[in-house]
Amino acid sequence: AVVSINSASINHNPIFRSLHRYYEGSPFVEANIKNISDSELPVDVSFYIPTMMENPHTESITLPPKSDDTYNLGVSFSSDVLTSAKASFDNLVQPDIKVAYKQDGEEKLAQKKLESSYVLGKGKLTWSDPEMIASYFTTQDVVVDKFARTNIQAYSEVLKKYFGKTNLGRAIILYDALGSFGLVYNVDPSTPFLQISDDKSAFDTVKYPWELLDDKIGDCDDLATLYGTLLNNIGIETMWL
């Protein structure tokens, strides 16, 4: 064998399912790969994270001759990363990385197990990084879009008569629509926001907007996220304070 994997590590631990889009847009794995041959060598590098992938993520690179280099690799997750049966649960998993290549016409494979990683369920976040809440603003979701557009259209005459079609008027209509829809506030018994928002080590659970519209009951962060998402859907920018 002329290729070996000296080391490999994921840049994030724990791994938040809610941040899957962010992960896909930045380097996710760092791998040090050695090629002891005298020739450059095309290889396929793949790695797999249980519960988050149906198939390994694969990238093709060319190793320089007599090289011992570190490579930053991207990632792509399964389309059901938020909807699979395992998506609601926390999992301790052991990712692995493989390098496939040909040596003298023969298929060769170098592989290595990575350090175990915690994959947190789809609703988990930490308030140590408040910007994480942005990943729950699914403004283009069909359920969100239907709720926002249907209510704005249903009260278009009220909007025109009393609010002059202003953003404030549209915001009031959506706020009132959420009440008429039957949403109920209920403090999260396991992770009440006021108790854990300043605890940088605690994990909170937030519902996606489509989940709250289905459940009709949620904590303050669930309700604020849904309302902000609806406002963004109709073009009103919001900020979480």
Where in this protein do the model-derived segments appear?
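Beta-sheet-dominated interaction scaffolds and their linkers
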Residues: A1-E30
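Asparagine-centered strand-capping/turn motif at beta-strand->loop junctions
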Residues: A31-S37
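Short, hydrophobic/aromatic beta-strand segments
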Residues: D38-F47
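Intrinsically disordered, low-complexity Pro/Gly/Ser/Thr-rich segments with frequent PxxP/GP/PP motifs
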Residues: Y48-D90
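Short, aromatic- and glycine-rich surface loops/edge beta-strands on solvent-exposed regions
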Residues: T83-D104
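Short beta-strand elements
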Residues: E106-Q140
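Secondary-structure boundary elements
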Residues: A134-D215
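Hydrophobic/aromatic-rich core segments of domains that either
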Residues: D221-L241
